[in-house]
């Protein structure tokens, strides 16, 4: 087993070392397609984690696509080989860090896509080496901070997309050296945009996206309001909606006045101070060291009451334009928008980028969508908020297939029929806030496959049916705040990749984590404030879930309302044991990993969350291999044990432990012989010494202490079998003067022997015998080898007989031989020879 593990680890190490030196042609790993002499290299989902090991393609210009790979960190010189790349896609890589110099070598790069990653900061050295960059996309990340000078080297940058991040402010002069024409900062946490240091450097912008930020409509927002009012009509600027203070919540910034923004009068008149020469936008240094300016000093001025600043400059009042900026703005202002039909009570304007129509029917006392006559063609945005619309029919949006934004907020809508929006397949933003909707069900949102932003706040929603949001696979923002929700169905968010969720000011006493909150895998912001949280055991799971989230995801802290002793206390300040005393009786599991398993209690019982994610495939394969090897090893050991245990002699002999006797089978057979009855062989001679030989030859290797044993006879008689060695010792002590006699020897050994004892072939008695009978019992040895010599029978007795039986075919012949009278001298010689042995 250990050998297998060693071999596997060695193979992995060797393969790793080999990979570090291998350089592969990129078109052998990725797909390369040439379109109009431009090569497109697609390395999506090919498990690339070291692009510097790939050889660049043989092409003057090419586009690189490294989406959906394992590029968690970009190290210096990662793309050093790709000097002719004009675009680079790095989206969906879970990219967390970009080290300085990672893009060195990409001198020809024009477009960089970093969307859908986990970046938290853009450093000053992040974009070194890509000074020719014109397009930068970094949306749907976790960016909180942008360091000063992050874009200082990007003099040609025109498009910057930073929407749906966690940016709360923009540093001073962040866009000073860029040439931005498109800026998207939607879906962040920006509350204000100062003119000095930010807005003054984006005078050439033609599109600015400001939506979905918590704008603080106070005195700090006066510079932005003044700047927006002075922008020309053909420049698209997204709506900035006030979130604070509460009396201006939901109001458009452009609809507010200075008195509402700044009631105390402080800063009500927006002034632009004179900037020092170092901060002048267009200037250069002469050889004498003096600064020459191509634009006038910014004077501290106040726009006159009778003059419309927008007619003068196109930029905020007090800022004189350079010739370049002025010519650009004039070209936009002199462009005549196309003539398109516009509904009578509404105001329409054309979007400069795609010539789409923006229809503004806000607060026109419209009671039905059928009043919009004539219906606008090619409408991209439709604002009908602030009216008295009560019902919405299926036919109301039949001619609005190209809508990108639909605003139905602040009406009196109570019920929305099914399939109302089924033909709005291009809709990305839907506002239904400020109505009287009580229930949501799946049929309402059928057809909204591209919807990204859904606003349902300030309604009377009490119930949301299961699967309501499943038809919106691109939904990223959902506002359900200020409703009457008490619970959410299980898996309500499983079909929507929500990044921002607002559940503030509802009736939630607790929210289940399992099946509801744990489905929010792409969450970047959640607001749970203002709910009557019941700080008991049911809320422990929510508390643990909130604590695991990264900093800044939860907008505001959760406060308890019940029980009374915890009222107005922040949930995070209470320990789990205080919320749920039952946890004191349960031993807490030690934390052995950064993401331990968490046990909590819900109304359905204790639930245990999984410890951080799925097991890597390599570890899983290695574990299965180890288990397989251990199983084979254990099975082999069991097999060997069973075979060795079963390897035993086939026959055992009772009382005899020597394996030499393995071929001998003893059979005891009882004989009922009377003492006064003579056997049929009573006339035969008997030599008692053969009993000793038999005892020696059939002890089968017993120990010395076991060589002498007794056979008990039923009447109580005993036959003693002595060892030959003991017999020889006894013979040595016999008096030499004693006459050698067979009869005397027999009398000495068997004092009460029978006279009808005879012997024949004494020397052959050493050979094997068929059977041995002892005192009424018969010991048989089965005949297995036919080639053995004839066996002899030995019988001795006094009240018991020792019988050695032969086969029936030999019995009569042996009996005939034994009936002849024995030669005394022959017997004497054999006895003498035996004693010497």
UniProtKB/Swiss-Prot annotation:
Q: Where are the LRR repeats?
A: 60-81, 84-105, 108-129, 132-153, 156-177, 179-200, 378-399, 402-423, 426-447, 450-471, 474-495, 497-518
- Tissue spec: Expressed in the cerebral cortex of the brain and at higher levels in some astrocytic brain tumors such as astrocytomas, glioblastomas and primitive neuroectodermal tumors.
Signal peptide feature range: 1-18
Record field: transmembrane: 619-639
Q: Where is the LRRNT domain?
A: 333-375
Using the UniProt annotation, give the residues that carry a glycan (glycosylation sites): 81, 325
List UniProt keywords, sorted A-Z.
Cell membrane, Glycoprotein, Leucine-rich repeat, Membrane, Repeat, Signal, Transmembrane, Transmembrane helix
The subcellular location is:
Membrane; Cell membrane
* One Gene Ontology CC term in the entry: plasma membrane
Q: Is the Cell membrane keyword given for this protein?
A: yes
Q: Which GO terms describe its biological process?
A: axonogenesis; behavioral fear response; cell population proliferation; long-term synaptic potentiation; memory; positive regulation of synapse assembly; regulation of synapse organization; smoothened signaling pathway
Q: Does the keyword Transcription regulation apply?
A: no
Q: What InterPro entries is this protein classified in?
A: Cys-rich_flank_reg_C (IPR000483), Leu-rich_rpt (IPR001611), Leu-rich_rpt_typical-subtyp (IPR003591), LRR_dom_sf (IPR032675)
Q: Which residues form the LRRCT domain?
A: 213-264, 531-582
Job of this protein: It is involved in synaptogenesis and promotes synapse differentiation. Suppresses neurite outgrowth.
Subunit structure, per the record?
Answer: Interacts (via LRR 1 and 2 repeats) with PTPRD (via extracellular domain).
Q: Which family does it belong to?
A: Belongs to the SLITRK family.
What protein does this entry describe? SLIT and NTRK-like protein 4
Supply the source organism's classification. Answer: Eukaryota, Metazoa, Chordata, Craniata, Vertebrata
């Amino acid at each position: 087993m250990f050998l297998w593990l060693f071999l596997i680890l060695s193979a992995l190490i060797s393969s790793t070392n080999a990979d570090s030196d291998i350089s592969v042609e990129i078109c052998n790993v990725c797909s390369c397609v040439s379109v109009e002499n431009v090569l497109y290299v697609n390395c999506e989902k090919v498990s690339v984690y070291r692009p510097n090991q790939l050889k660049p393609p043989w092409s003057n210009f090419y586009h690189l696509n490294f989406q959906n790979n394992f590029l968690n960190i970009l190290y210096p010189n990662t793309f050093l080989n790709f000097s002719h790349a004009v675009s680079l896609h790095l989206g969906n890589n879970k990219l967390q860090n970009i080290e300085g110099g990672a893009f060195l070598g990409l001198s020809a790069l024009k477009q960089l896509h970093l969307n859908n990653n986990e970046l938290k900061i853009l450093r000053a050295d992040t974009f070194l080496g890509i000074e020719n960059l014109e397009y930068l996309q970094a949306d749907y990340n976790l960016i909180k901070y942008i360091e000063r000078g992050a874009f200082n080297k990007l003099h040609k940058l025109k498009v910057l997309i930073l929407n749906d991040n966690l940016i709360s402010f923009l540093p001073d002069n962040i866009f000073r050296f860029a040439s931005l024409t498109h800026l998207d900062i939607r879906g962040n946490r920006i509350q204000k945009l100062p003119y000095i240091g930010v807005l003054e450097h984006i005078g050439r912008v033609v599109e600015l996206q400001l939506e979905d930020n918590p704008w603080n409509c106070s005195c700090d927002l006066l510079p932005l309001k003044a700047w927006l009012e002075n922008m020309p009509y053909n420049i698209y600027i997204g709506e900035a909606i006030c979130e604070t203070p509460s009396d201006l919540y939901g109001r458009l910034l452009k609809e507010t006045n200075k008195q509402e923004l700044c009631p105390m009068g402080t800063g009500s008149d927006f002034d632009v101070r004179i900037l020092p020469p170092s901060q002048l936008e267009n200037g250069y240094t002469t050889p004498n060291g003096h600064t020459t300016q191509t634009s006038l000093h910014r004077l501290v001025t106040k726009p006159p009451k009778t003059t419309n600043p927008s007619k003068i400059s196109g930029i905020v009042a007090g800022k004189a334009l350079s010739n370049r900026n002025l010519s650009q703005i004039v070209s936009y202002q002199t462009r005549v928008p196309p003539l398109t039909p516009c509904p009578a009570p509404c105001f329409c304007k054309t979007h400069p980028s795609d010539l789409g129509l923006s229809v503004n029917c806000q607060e026109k006392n419209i009671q039905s969508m059928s009043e919009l006559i004539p219906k606008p063609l090619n409408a991209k945005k439709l604002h009908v908020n602030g009216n008295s619309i009560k019902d919405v029919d299926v036919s109301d949006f039949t001619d609005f297939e190209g809508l990108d934004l639909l605003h139905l907020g602040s009406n009196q809508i109570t019920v929305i029929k099914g399939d109302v929006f089924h033909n709005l397949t291009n809709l990305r933003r839907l506002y239904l806030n400020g109505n009287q909707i009580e229930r949501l069900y799946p049929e309402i949102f059928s057809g909204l496959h591209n919807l990204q932003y859904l606003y349902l706040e300030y309604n009377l929603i009490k119930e949301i049916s299961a699967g309501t949001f499943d038809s919106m696979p691109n939904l990223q923002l959902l506002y359900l705040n200020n409703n009457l929700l008490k619970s959410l169905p299980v898996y309500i968010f499983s079909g929507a990749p929500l990044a921002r969720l607002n559940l503030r000011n509802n009736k939630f006493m607790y929210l289940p984590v399992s099946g509801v909150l744990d489905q929010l895998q792409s969450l970047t912001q959640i607001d749970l404030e203002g709910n009557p949280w019941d700080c008991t055991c049911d809320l422990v799971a929510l508390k643990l879930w909130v604590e695991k989230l990264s900093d800044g995801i939860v907008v505001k802290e959760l406060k308890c309302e019940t029980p009374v002793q915890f009222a107005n206390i922040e949930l995070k300040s209470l320990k789990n044991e205080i919320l749920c005393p039952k946890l004191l009786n349960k031993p807490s599991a030690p934390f052995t990993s950064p993401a331990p398993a968490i046990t909590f209690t819900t109304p359905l019982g204790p639930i245990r969350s999984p410890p951080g994610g799925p097991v890597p495939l390599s570890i899983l394969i290695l574990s299965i291999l180890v288990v397989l090897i251990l199983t084979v090893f254990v099975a082999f050991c069991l097999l060997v044990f069973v075979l060795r245990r079963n390897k035993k002699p086939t026959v055992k002999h009772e009382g005899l432990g020597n394996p030499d006797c393995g071929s001998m089978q003893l059979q005891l057979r009882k004989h009922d012989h009377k003492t006064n009855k003579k056997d049929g062989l009573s006339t035969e001679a008997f030599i008692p010494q053969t009993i000793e030989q038999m005892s020696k030859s059939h002890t089968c290797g017993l120990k010395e202490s076991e060589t002498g044993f007794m056979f008990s006879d039923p009447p109580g008689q005993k036959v003693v079998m002595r060892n030959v060695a003991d017999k020889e010792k006894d013979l040595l002590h016999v008096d030499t003067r004693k006459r050698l006699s067979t009869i005397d020897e027999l009398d000495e050994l068997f004092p009460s022997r029978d006279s009808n004892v005879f012997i024949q072939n004494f020397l052959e008695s050493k050979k094997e015998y068929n059977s041995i009978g002892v005192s009424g019992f018969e010991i048989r040895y089965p005949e297995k080898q036919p080639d053995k010599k004839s066996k002899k029978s030995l019988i001795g007795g006094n009240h018991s007989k020792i019988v050695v039986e032969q086969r029936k075919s030999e019995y009569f012949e042996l009996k005939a031989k034994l009936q002849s009278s024995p030669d005394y001298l022959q017997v004497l010689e054999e006895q003498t020879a035996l004693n010497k042995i």
